[in-house]
Amino acid sequence: MKCVLVFTTALCLLSACTGVPQDIEPVTGFDQQRYLGTWYEIARLDHSFEEGLSRVTANYSLNDDGSIKVINRGYNAEEGQWQEADGRAVFVGDSDVGHLKVSFFGPFYASYVVFELDNQYSTAYITGYNRDYLWLMSRTPEVSEEALAAFKARAVAEGFDLTELILVAQ
């Protein structure tokens, strides 16, 4: 019985990691084909898996099984080398909703929620399963001051704490 309880608890915790923060809606009308390609990380709330990285990019392409291949890459100036993480993303529900789960470690998935995406697919606002995760991604290494201000305003309106926001050097 104890094993069943531990397994059930672990399952619940893992499924919580693929949820959506309360009151945040993933975009609808999401077009996977248009989203594929290279994105530059413009701003983020820092986490241990990206700590100290600059020149961060994410590249998305299709795997043979229909899932999305994810290659995240960033430069660690302290170590003087590039770091790369290969992962796999799949839609949590419908493929026209910007809510995916991504794994870099076997069966363990984390939420990837696109909650803002412009019509040209040139900028995207991303969060994880809670408001501790936030990214501004762009098709270009830089965005205008207006685009950055719009991102910050929307993030604050959605309840994100931006005191630890990092502008990523590209």
What are the roles of these predicted feature ranges?
Residues 1-5:
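Positively charged n-region of N-terminal signal peptides that target proteins for export
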Residues 17-170:
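A beta-rich soluble binding module of mature secreted/lumenal proteins
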Residues 13-14:
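Bacterial Sec-type N-terminal signal peptides, specifically the leucine/valine-rich hydrophobic h-region
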